[in-house]
């Protein structure tokens, strides 16, 4: 997305929001950090006009963490109300579903960054979001692994995929999934 399209989206949101004061903008999909200059430009633009329109913007960003560095973490901590960190759990699970462009896994690269970011936010206003698939129906182990890494805010959700995909969840998987949720509730 270009900065101009982003500005038009902010203008549309302000106009369509009527008398609502609090507005939320979430940066996600693809990888927002690949277009970080545009993210910053949109935040700056929204901040520059929010008082004029009696609005209060809250921003959230979702990232796979590959491009996170200290400068970006500092910006996120100052400008993003919430941050969603994509991690699917155990190393072998995450690396299977989230390989880097060259095919190598991302786990070893992102986990220390995610831990640093979560700690810099005092373990609040973030969450680690995992996706479970047919490949890791034992996802309660992934939740426990993420907790063992020190994360306090954890969410896992089922994959949404074409049923023909080998990682898609099927109706036959549901009893196992229900059991995993029961195990987490204990």
Question: What do these predicted ranges mean?
Answer:
Residues 29-30:
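Short acidic donor-binding/metal-coordinating loop in glycosyltransferase active sites
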Residues 33, 100-104, 168-175:
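Charge-dense, low-complexity intrinsically disordered segments
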């Amino acid at each position: 997305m270009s900065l101009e399209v982003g500005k038009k989206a902010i203008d549309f949101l302000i106009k369509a929001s009527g008398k609502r004061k609090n507005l939320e903008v979430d940066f996600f999909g693809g990888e927002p950090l690949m277009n970080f200059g545009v993210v910053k430009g949109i935040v700056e633009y929204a901040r520059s006009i929010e008082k004029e329109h009696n609005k209060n913007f809250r921003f959230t960003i979702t990232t796979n963490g590959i491009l996170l560095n200290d400068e970006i973490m500092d910006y996120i901590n100052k400008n993003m109300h919430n941050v969603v960190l994509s991690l699917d759990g155990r190393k072998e699970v995450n690396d299977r579903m989230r390989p880097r462009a060259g095919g190598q896994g991302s786990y070893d690269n992102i986990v220390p960054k995610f831990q640093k970011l979560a700690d810099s936010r005092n373990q609040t206003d973030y969450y680690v979001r995992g996706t479970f698939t047919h490949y890791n129906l034992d996802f309660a182990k992934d939740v426990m692994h993420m907790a063992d890494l020190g994360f306090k805010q954890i969410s896992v959700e089922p994959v949404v995929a074409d049923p023909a995909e080998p990682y898609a969840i099927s109706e036959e998987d549901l009893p196992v999934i229900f059991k995993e949720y029961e195990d987490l509730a204990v």
